[in-house]
Amino acid sequence: MTKAGKHLFLDILHSEGVEIIFGNPGTTELPLLDAFVVEDRLRYVLGLNEVVVMGMADGWAQATGKLAVCNLHAAPGLGNAMGMLYNAAKAGAPVLVTAGQQDMTIRLTEPLLWDDLATMARPLCKWSFEVNSIEELPRAVRRAAKVALTAPTGPVFLSIPGDVLTAMAPEGLDIGEPTRIGAGIRGDANEIAKAAALISQAETPVIFAGDCVANRDAFAEIVAFAEAVGAPVYMEGMANRAAYPSNHALYASTVPRMTPALRSVMQNHDLLISIG
């Protein structure tokens, strides 16, 4: 039995581990909302403003580490969400942002609410693409999920025309399976040895801890390292997440953002160890 694009889209999202779609929809998203009449695996959480739903998706992705989905309405909806999309990009949040596009049959007339959505989103996304057919839909969603969840993680964007969501998939269309790229890396042994020598020779080292410590859930490791080295720890000045427990004895503060204040911190130390 063939399915419409709207149902295939939800099938693929479910298989990618998506649990919630945060959305502020409009007319171009009606096919997707119609699919939720029978959808019982995913929730659609409605927000009254694009800033709100984009922020919710960003927060969900950061808190769970899972792929979040934000559903917006055409060009105005994407435009209204850009500030929060910027935040998601800076935080490295794995969010799939989608926007309903006008039907492909009328896009040459540049109809109301139309714009080049993929180009609009591209500066703030790891990958941005407009789906041009029902046949492209599975591969586009699979690629978007893989890119968003591959380190360094971050938001991706898909523009999905309404007639792609309403089109019936050809018999036997392969919707694929989730794929992931392993993030395991090994540092260069020579460089590690050099760093170890610097640390062992330092008398007053200091540690600056960044967001990636939290993103990798490396709290125990950085605490153990700080205790072994005996170095105070500063978190980055405009952090998205806390990278070090503030109740720990070696926690100092956040990194000052102004040069004079930063200099006053650094002049007390002979080695800066930047982590994450």
What residue spans do the PLM features occupy?
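N-terminal alpha/beta PP-like core and its mobile active-site loop of ThDP/TPP-dependent enzymes
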Residues: 1-276
